[in-house]
């Protein structure tokens, strides 16, 4: 059946112009843009001057970080105008291995939202991570033939690239042999090190926190993903990239974003809105969110309103608010007047579901498990940078005579990362600054990328209660104060995702967020999202794993106590 969308203003992403035209669609494809009339179609819709633009593409997202299953994420993203995402399932792969990747492929099959996959490159991220699985190059090879697999996901182990680690280089070369892209992840890397990283065949990065850093990469041929997530907020710093000549090498991504933020603020549409509000050209922002992402990833016939292109289209009220009225996915109406039209949820094989549902293996913990035996007074403390995933090393005097080193007046709290997938009993314990808790404890099974149990608290008793609640729930988030659980959020899918509708997940997420802030958490941070990255030993500078503190730049374990 042919559909005519007439009397529309078309966003031409090839020319950065707004043009008056009609759009003729046949099945999944656009077959004409121009002076078509009612006689050319079986069905006609008069848009009365509204705007048609291509569907938005999120070029880098971890579905697991939304805490939603793929079908629930689709219900949230589609009304925001997102018709395609490029997902790296390295969160669930670290927990469940190949079964985790299979889960993501099956759970996203035939959704109105097109879900493409980048295969996880670093499972584990480095040798300092203890994960539920290890994926080598030979494990990934068979998956490159899947039609929705576009390449190798973010190569976080940039020290391995610089050292020419054989396994790392094999993964990169194998992706290239299949004609696939390799995503980058190398925060703060510059100069000769960056040259070597790019020369290895890594063609993009989403970790830039300054315009200068991004411009160096663009000038050396990389594509830049401008990220605005829940914890990592780089849009403001990277606004100069919306200008020429930089914009032609950029796309828009969220990376990690919580459901409440998706529902309340939006997705890629939110990034476009904020860029426009900051004075950047709306057509440039839309091009970055559509055609440039599609062309970079090799999505043929996607990302434009033009003959031969897939009819992934948005109907907008205007370019200032980017308010999405309707969404067409592959020629079918998926969102009408802001409401998602029901679609069938994909089926997942029972063996895959069983693996994902049983990922927590850990003995009960006691307060003594969080005790630190003093070996001196000067300690390394991880210091959070608000609005960033980067952390600093703070060496300071710790008074162990009171509260075993915790000092809420100086914002020094305890941090523990405990292995939860193989029951090794390994744990790293130290101190964290920048969270701001005045009492209580918080715990989560979401701790990038190994997703072991992570706990922050003001006292050992509450830390043990919070940790054990995560254990009994089979994963999730918990907030404890004065011996009582005051908020919790179960995440039974690999300890990473909920099985509830998006609105309920957002409500639970907001409840734990509010509870943490009532305990004194800093208003400058998103506590659970920031906490989740404190164990990722590939983002500078100091991180905590189950093996202890890691100096990311030197890729070595460092002692808690500074002798």
Q: What function would you assign to each model-found segment?
A:
Residues 4, 55-57, 117, 252, ...:
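Residue-level marker for buried hydrophobic side chains located in beta-strands
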